[in-house]
Amino acid sequence: MLLELALWLGQDIRGFNVFGYITLRTVLAALTALAISLTAGPGVIRWLAAKKIGQAVRDDGPKSHLTKAGTPTMGGALILIAIGITILLWGDLRNAYVWVTLLVTLGFGAVGWVDDWRKVVHRDPKGLASRWKYFWTSAIALGASIFLGLSATTPAETELIVPFFKAVAYPLGVYGFIALTYFVINGTSHAVNLTDGLDGLAIMPTVMVAGALAIFAYVAGHAGFSKYLGVPYIAGAGELAVFCGAICGAGLGFLWFNAYPAEVFMGDVGALALGAALGTIAVVVRQEIVLFIMGGLFVAETLSVMVQVLYFKASGGKRIFRMAPLHHHYELSGWKETQVVVRFWIITLMLVLFGLSTLKLR
C-alpha cells in the first residue's frame, strides 16, 4: 500500500520514486517486520500465557526439557502477523509471485494453527490427524504448484538449474515442474517443522536462508545481473527479495523472545509456514538445489527421523540415533542445548555461504 502511495506521489513530488527500488524496500521490510515483532511480542506472549497455551513436553526426551513445560507456544502467529502487515505495506501487490508466496505462507500457517490449537487448547496429544494435516498442506502446495506451472511464460521458469555448471539446465515440462514444486514446498515446510525443537534452533537458520534467497531473488529479477551471473531471468521475481526481508526481520524479532531460555515457542503455525515460504521462493527463483544445500540442517534433521524410523522397523526395535530428530541425539550425547543450537547455526552459516558461492562459481 505504501509503495502504491509513494509511486503516486512520485508523479508530482520529487524523491518519492526512490521507494520503487527493491533494495530499499527490502531493508524497510526487514526493519518494519522487526519493529512489529519486538513491539507486539510481549503482548502476544501475555495473551498466550493467559489462555494457557503452553508447550507440552515428552517425558522420554532430554530431562532438561521438563522445565520448558507450560512455556507459551504458537508464537509463530507473531511472525505471520509481522510478515503479513509488512508485505501489505512494502510489497508490490500487483506482483503474482508476492501473492502466491503470501497465500502459501498463511495457508500453511493456518494448518499449523489448527494442529497447535487442538494439541494445546483441546488437550488432544495427536492434534490435527496426520492424514488431514498432510492433506491440507498437500492441497495448498499442489495449488501453488499448478498455478506457477501454468502461468510460466518462458522455458527458464520451468527448468531445473544445476549449480556450479554454466548454462546447465534440465527442462522439466509443466508436469515435472508441478511435481518438483509440490515436493519442495511441502518437504521444506515439514523439514523446518522437524528442526524446531530447541530454543532458537529453527528460526535463525530460517533467517539465514531467507537472507540468501533475497540475494538470489534480486539477481533473478534483474535482467543485467542475471545475465552476468548466468542465472535465469525471471521477470518479477525480484519482489520476493522484499518478502525475504520481511521473513528476516520478523524472524530476528521472534528470536529476541525465543532465544535461550525461550519465553515463547514457534509451534507448527510458524514452522510450517516459514518452511513453505522458503520452498516457494526457492522454486520461483529456480534455486531448488541451492535451497537443498543452504538448508542442509533441515535436510539432516529430516533424514535422521526417516532413517531412525526405517531402521527401527527393519531391525526389530534397534536405533541408530539416541533420539530423533538429530538435535535430540546430540543433547542425549552430552551436548548442552545452547551448544547444539549455536553449532547448528554455524553449520548453517557455512552452508549458506557455500550456496551463495554458486552465483559466481560456474
From Swiss-Prot:
The molecular function terms of the Gene Ontology recorded here are: metal ion binding; phospho-N-acetylmuramoyl-pentapeptide-transferase activity; UDP-N-acetylmuramoyl-L-alanyl-D-glutamyl-meso-2,6-diaminopimelyl-D-alanyl-D-alanine:undecaprenyl-phosphate transferase activity
**Cofactor(s) recorded in Swiss-Prot or TrEMBL:** Mg(2+)
Taxonomic superkingdom: Bacteria
Protein's name in the database: Phospho-N-acetylmuramoyl-pentapeptide-transferase
Catalysed reactions, as listed in the record = UDP-N-acetyl-alpha-D-muramoyl-L-alanyl-gamma-D-glutamyl-meso-2,6-diaminopimeloyl-D-alanyl-D-alanine + di-trans,octa-cis-undecaprenyl phosphate = di-trans,octa-cis-undecaprenyl diphospho-N-acetyl-alpha-D-muramoyl-L-alanyl-D-glutamyl-meso-2,6-diaminopimeloyl-D-alanyl-D-alanine + UMP
Pathway in which the depicted protein is active: Cell wall biogenesis; peptidoglycan biosynthesis
Keyword check for Metal-binding: yes
Extract one GO BP annotation from the record: cell wall organization
